């Protein structure tokens, strides 16, 4: 078994250095009927960078690592897929800017790959999924395409100001897991570094209380980051050896600003709301030392997979979007030692919900069956899998036949030979 989510490895790897080489690689694959799997950094939680079929070729984009343009005034950057968060951070920091980091995604990850796959960003509750603007790439049939200003023949570097809306066709390439083509250049948004940052904690005795509190605080539009974690996840987040002194659930709220007075009035507002909720807004979490600093560190520099895994153990996240009522029903499906994170989306109308399965290495086959059983129950309850894994793709297709019939017709239009990451997303 290659990984929890995939049994296959690519037969070989190619490393293009420019979009022309990407285009030639795709054209050759079409001639030879060879499946391609685009890889930027392999840090996407569900191993979508590994093939779902035999004899695939990995297209390693790590050598395409140029920061084409950085606009500090408008807080945007045009980058290639090999640019990592660590690489982009240095020039951004010099301009007083920062990137929007993703949950579980380390600094060595591709910025473009992370944003294209819509890995959940800590900043989504505040900024929503608008981290990408225009893009350029090569379709699965070998044709070059671009969106917004990048599609125009202007001799200027700042081709990002005319982006795309969520309803436009370009968004099909988001969360597509490389099934429609390869993006070779894209504009991403940046944020200003705030000198004042404050972390607050709100303890909850159950998951129902946690989702209610998340809804209440996100409605104020004051948190820059906000999420809830159960005590298993929380202990790992804070580097604690056990969960004894932690509440069953903790809502974490981060406020940012440019003056201490700004943080002070935000704290006053949030404290008043906490009292209405019959709870307490705290800057400490039990006996944990420097809990707030540890949260800020994890947000700015996520640990990644190793946050949850130890020697001899495995970790498998279940990536979903669900309503509060669906979450409450789903919680009982997971073992007591499971970690879980919930982040409000759309002002609390729904949530990014990431419970997980823990297991000892060697138990993968058994845990796969558990994973699929749980996924089936979640699908029947109406829970959405925004990025299906290779394991549950068929299940997701079976529950959404009309949607995937349309997706297949779109894929056939741009990938007539079915060479781009076949069998991903059930395509």
Report the location of each language-model feature.
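Glycine-/small-residue-rich beta-strand-loop submotif within the FAD-binding core of flavoenzymes
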Residues: 5-6, 49-86, 123-124, 190
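Short, conserved charged micro-motifs
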Residues: 21-24, 87, 207-213, 259-268, ...
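Glycine-rich N-terminal segment of FAD-binding domains in flavoprotein oxidoreductases
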Residues: 2-64
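General beta-strand structural signal in soluble alpha/beta enzymes
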Residues: 15-16, 36-40, 47, 59-61, ...
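A conserved active-site cap/scaffold subdomain adjacent to cofactor or substrate pockets
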Residues: 197, 203-209, 243-281
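FAD-binding subdomain of flavoenzyme oxidoreductases
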Residues: 67-70, 81, 85-212
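Conserved glycine-rich FAD pyrophosphate-binding loop
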Residues: 8, 47-56, 60-62, 273-427
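Short amphipathic alpha-helix segments
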Residues: 209-238, 324-336, 367-375
């Amino acid at each position: 078994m290659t990984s929890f989510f995939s049994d296959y490895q690519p037969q070989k790897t190619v490393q293009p250095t420019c979009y022309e080489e990407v285009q030639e690689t795709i054209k050759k694959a079409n001639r030879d009927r060879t499946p391609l799997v685009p890889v930027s950094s392999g840090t996407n939680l569900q191993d979508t960078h590994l093939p779902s079929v035999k004899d695939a070729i990995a297209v390693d984009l790590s050598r395409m690592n140029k920061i084409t343009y950085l606009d500090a005034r408008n807080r945007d950057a045009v980058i290639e897929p090999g640019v990592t968060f660590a690489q982009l951070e240095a020039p951004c920091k010099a301009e007083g800017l920062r990137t929007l980091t993703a949950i579980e995604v380390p600094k060595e990850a591709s910025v473009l790959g992370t944003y294209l796959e819509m890995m959940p960003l800590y900043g989504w509750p505040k900024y929503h999924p608008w981290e990408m603007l225009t893009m350029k790439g090569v379709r699965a049939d070998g044709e070059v395409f671009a969106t917004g200003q990048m599609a125009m023949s202007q001799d200027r570097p700042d081709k990002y100001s005319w982006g795309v809306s969520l309803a436009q066709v370009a968004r099909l390439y988001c969360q597509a897991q490389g099934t429609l083509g390869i993006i070779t250049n894209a504009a991403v948004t940046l944020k200003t570094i705030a000198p004042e940052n404050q972390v607050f904690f709100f303890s909850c005795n159950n998951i129902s209380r946690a989702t209610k509190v998340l809804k209440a605080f996100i409605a104020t539009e004051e948190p820059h980051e906000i999420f809830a974690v159960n005590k298993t996840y929380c202990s790992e987040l804070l580097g604690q050896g056990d969960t004894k002194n932690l509440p069953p659930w903790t809502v974490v709220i981060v406020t940012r600003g440019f003056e201490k007075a700004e943080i002070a009035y935000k704290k006053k507002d949030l404290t008043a709301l906490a009292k209405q909720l019959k709870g307490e807004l705290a800057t400490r979490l039990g006996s944990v030392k420097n809990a707030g600093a540890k949260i800020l560190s994890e947000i700015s520099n996520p640990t990644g997979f190793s946050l949850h895994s130890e020697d001899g153990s495995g970790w498998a996240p279940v990536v979903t979007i669900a309503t509060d009522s669906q979450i409450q029903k789903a919680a009982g499906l997971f073992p007591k030692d499971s970690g879980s994170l919930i982040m409000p989306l759309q002002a609390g109308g729904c949530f990014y919900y990431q419970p997980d399965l823990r297991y000892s290495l060697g138990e993968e086959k058994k845990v796969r069956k558990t994973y699929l059983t749980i996924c089936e129950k979640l699908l029947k309850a109406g829970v959405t899998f925004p990025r299906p894994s290779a394991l549950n793709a068929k299940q997701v297709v079976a529950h959404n036949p009309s949607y995937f019939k349309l997706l297949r017709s779109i894929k056939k239009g741009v990938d007539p030979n079915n060479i781009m990451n076949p069998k991903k997303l059930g395509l």
